[in-house]
Amino acid sequence: MKNMTLAHITEVCGGTYFGPEEKKTAEVTDIVTDSRKAGEGSLFVAIPGERVDGHKFIPNVASQGALAVISEQTLETPPCPYILVKDSMEAIKAMAEYYMPVSYTHLRA
């Protein structure tokens, strides 16, 4: 299993990190989009949806021990470190591609 620190994730997602410098080297234990599943060491990805905007759950995940969040919005008073990105879904895709690179060399066209 690859170690993914907040610094790695910030780079992979092309985002901007906001938070204490010492937290950048902390390793993420899991990545979640469901705020109810966030816990100690989690990275919560806030996704704006048609009915519910995941950004409204950021205070909840911070109180549950989440290490950080990925947000499309600038947080005025962040309850925990966060990575600002242009598109949360693209950030998830970038993290997945980094974590589990796919090789298509075995396919014939």
Regions found by a protein language model. Name each.
Residues 2-108:
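Short, basic phosphate-binding NTP loop
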